[in-house]
Structures are given as structure tokens and as C-alpha cells.
Amino acid sequence: MAKQKLTQNQKRRIHSNNAKALDRHRRQTKKQIDWQEDMLGETQDGVVVTRYSMHADVENAQGEVFRCNLRRTLAGVVVGDLVIWRQGHEKLQGISGVIEAVKPRKNELSRPDYYDGLKVMASNIDRIIIVSAVLPALSLNIIDRYLVICETANIPPVIVLNKIDLLSAEARQEAEQQLKIYRDIGYRTLMISAETGENMEKLTALLSQGTSIFVGQSGVGKSSLVNQIMPEVNAQTAEISENSGLGQHTTTSSRLYHLPQGGDLIDSPGIREFGLWHLDADQITKGYREFRHFLGACKFRDCKHLNDPQCALREAVEQGKIHPVRFDNYHRLISSKDEAKSQRHFTM
């Protein structure tokens, strides 16, 4: 007998009851750990390296990590946040201190959340590494989806194609041509193999500059890359299901790591679907960087860039100034956004 699916009202009640239970536990914890001024040292700078439901691990200037409570006035503290915190003179129930404030962020990576609206995943990022793979298939549509997120967040992306050791010479040449679409509009691309180590030195050199974060569908080899870059980190490799072709999610929480060669890496749970329903059509359009030069030049202000007469974008495609694959993917994203908005479904 097939398992009956939960209705939306049932899902909301479950979420509400769970939130109430967490809130009760949070309030009980706060009652138990009541930090007084004479129990705390001076304020100091720190960076959040891991965030849990009610606590966060903060690293000080000396590289020591302390588990901290959050002040009641703080909300949405995420990995990468630069914070002001105070260490307790003694540990209380395994808690070493308290985060007092979060410094202004230079940027943040967010995703839409069914219950909470827009949820920030990490902050203060220097580049987003979009990891794709040749198996189960190289999807330029998914790459474009991530690029729209990067452009909207104003975070530079790098497109990395993993598992190239599985490609024949002909397939490799075809993949090169597909990535050339992105190089021609100014994006950096890299073809690597975590299995054989091909071009891994180029990736590690790139990661040595600032803070990076990996994004990509499950099964593209993000955990394998982390293991290759930092063998000491126990990031289990996701195995691709022979039936579905989708990997199992193995990383459970976001964490910031310091790389041996320099730089920082935020390792986050694999993202299978990255919803765009929080963006309107205009934001998605501007998320295609090569479109921007032609925006505002259409005959009609409400041009949908389909069969509208004198559409500047369509004319640019016909003139070879915009790649037709990118233009087709754009319309697919617009259509899927409306469908996803009605369902508001995606998996982490």
C-alpha cells in the first residue's frame, strides 16, 4: 500500500509543533545559562566556523575554537560571519562564551526556504565554486541556475567540471566547447579530476586566495574534492545511485576550514535543487550578464523576450552576440521559476 502524502496543513502543523519544541528547549537553555557581566571577559573578534541550532563555534585570532551561545537579540548567525564575542571565565554546560554582535557582511549566499522565506547559508564569500560533473550528465541549465544566484549575490563564480577522467577524447572536446560558452562571456572555468588529480593544483591555487564555497548537485564529487584538498577532513564521498543517478547527501552541516596552502573553504551540504522562486523575472534577466547591454532596447517595456516584435535580446541571439543555449536556458528558468513558486519545493 502506497504511503499517504502529508497535506500542506499537516506539514505546517508538524513544522509549528517542531518550532515550538525548539523554542521551549531554547528558552530552557537560556534560563540555565544566564551569562552575567562578571562571568565574561573582554570583547574580542572572531569568525563563525560552524553554526548549530542554538550555538555556534567561534574561532579567535589565535586559531582556537570556542562553542558559544548567541545573545537573544541576534538572529541568523551563519558560517563566515565576523563577530564580536566574549569568553566566559569558566565553561557552563560545555559552552565557553557568548556572541555579542555580528559585523556587517560584505555579501551573503541565500536560498529560498519554504517556511522561513529567504535563508542565508553563509557570508563573506570571495568566490563560489560551481561544481559540475559529466555523470550523470553535464547540465548547462543547472550551471546557469547557479550563475544567476552568483550574479544576484554579487559573488564571483568559478565553473569547475569534475570527473573528466571518465571522458573520451571526443567527449572531452565537446565538454570544452560547452565550457567555452561561459569563458566567452568572462567566466572562469576549470576541468579537473579528483580521482586522478588532473589540474587539482590549479584548483588549490585558486582556493588559496580568500574564502570559497562549493555548490553543486549531489553526486558531482564535492566531497571527493574536499577529501583531495584536505585529506584529514572526514567528508564521506557520496556514491551515485545506479538507479536514480543522484548521490546521497553525506555532509550534514556547513563548516569553515583553513586550507594548508592558505585560504578558507566553506564546506556545505550538497544542494540538489536551488530554487529561484524568490527572484522575479527582472532579477533573473539581469542575472545573465551578457543580457545587460541590451536591456532597455526592446520596442516594448514589458517585452517577454519571446516572440515580441523588435526584441533586443532575440536580435542579439540572431546576430551571434548572445549564445542560443544561454537564451533557451533563460526561458527555461523563467518557466520553471513560476512552476517552482507554486510548489516551493527543493531539497538540501
From Swiss-Prot:
GTP binds at N162, K163, I164, D165, G216, Q217, S218, G219, V220, G221, K222, S223, S224. GO terms for cellular component: cytoplasm. One of its GO terms (biological process) is ribosomal small subunit biogenesis. Residues 1-32 are annotated as: Disordered. Its EC number is 3.6.1.-. Zn(2+) binds at C298, C303, H305, C311. Keywords: Cytoplasm, GTP-binding, Hydrolase, Metal-binding, Nucleotide-binding, Ribosome biogenesis, RNA-binding, rRNA-binding, Zinc. Its cofactor is Zn(2+). InterPro entries: G_CP_dom, NA-bd_OB-fold, P-loop_NTPase, Ribosome_biogen_GTPase_RsgA, RsgA_GTPase_dom. Gene3D superfamilies: Nucleic acid-binding proteins, P-loop containing nucleotide triphosphate hydrolases, Probable gtpase engc, domain 3. It is found in: Cytoplasm. Binds 1 zinc ion per subunit. GO terms for molecular function: GTP binding; GTPase activity; metal ion binding; rRNA binding. Residues 106-274 form the CP-type G domain. Belongs to the TRAFAC class YlqF/YawG GTPase family. RsgA subfamily. One of several proteins that assist in the late maturation steps of the functional core of the 30S ribosomal subunit. Helps release RbfA from mature subunits. May play a role in the assembly of ribosomal proteins into the subunit. Circularly permuted GTPase that catalyzes slow GTP hydrolysis, GTPase activity is stimulated by the 30S ribosomal subunit. Monomer. Associates with 30S ribosomal subunit, binds 16S rRNA. This is Small ribosomal subunit biogenesis GTPase RsgA. It comes from Actinobacillus succinogenes (strain ATCC 55618 / DSM 22257 / CCUG 43843 / 130Z).
